[in-house]
Regions:
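An acidic, low-aromatic, low-complexity terminal/linker signal
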Residues: 1-164
C-alpha cells in the first residue's frame, strides 16, 4: 500500500507596503515589537541601525527600502522579524522591519508557482515563488538571498563594532 504524502511548509506571512510576503519559519527566529534603533554611520540607506537583543548587537534593515519602496512609517503593527541566515557557514541574525505580521500558514509544495518573469517590481532572485493563500497572492521570499554575501558582511561587521 502506498501512502500519498503531501509535503507542506510553514511560512510566516507579513505585509510590506500593500504586498503580502512569506518567509519559511525555519528562517524566522523571533518577532519583536518596534524599539529604539541606534543608527550606524556610513551604512546603506536600508540599514536602519542596530538594537540590543539579549546582549547581542542585532543589525536592523528596513524591508521597504530594500525592496525599493518608500521608507516605513511606523505604526502599532510595525515590528521586527528576526531572521536566522547562513553566511559562509556561520549563522547571522538580521532584524527586518515589516509593516505587519499576519499569520503562519501551511503551503503545500504543489501550490507554489514560480515568480513571474515580467511585471514584478522586486528582484526575482530573492522571491522563491508565489502561492495563493485564501484570496491573496503571497510572495515567498528566500531570505538568504535578500542580502548578498557582501551586504551581509558589511552589515554584520559594522553592527559588531557598534555600542548599543
Amino acid at each position: 500500500m502506498t501512502e500519498n504524502k503531501v509535503e507542506s511548509n510553514s511560512y510566516l506571512t507579513f505585509k510590506v507596503g500593500e504586498e503580502e510576503f512569506g518567509a519559511h519559519v525555519s528562517q524566522v527566529l523571533n518577532i519583536l515589537e518596534m524599539t529604539k534603533i541606534t543608527e550606524v554611520p556610513k551604512t546603506p540607506d536600508y540599514m536602519k541601525g542596530v538594537i540590543n537583543l539579549r546582549g547581542t548587537v542585532l543589525p536592523i534593515i528596513d524591508t521597504r527600502l530594500k525592496f525599493g519602496l518608500p521608507e516605513t512609517e511606523y505604526t502599532s503593527n510595525t515590528c521586527i522579524v528576526v531572521m536566522d541566515l547562513d553566511f559562509n557557514g556561520d549563522t547571522v541574525h538580521i532584524g527586518a522591519i515589516v509593516d505587519e505580521v499576519l499569520s503562519v500558514v501551511e503551503i503545500e509544495k504543489g501550490q507554489i508557482e514560480p515568480p513571474p518573469s515580467i511585471g514584478n517590481r522586486y528582484k526575482s532572485d530573492f522571491i522563491h515563488g508565489m502561492a495563493k493563500v485564501e484570496e491573496n497572492f503571497v510572495m515567498l521570499l528566500d531570505m538568504q538571498q535578500i542580502l548578498s554575501n557582501t551586504e551581509l558582511s558589511e552589515i554584520s561587521g559594522k553592527a559588531e563594532n557598534q555600542p548599543v
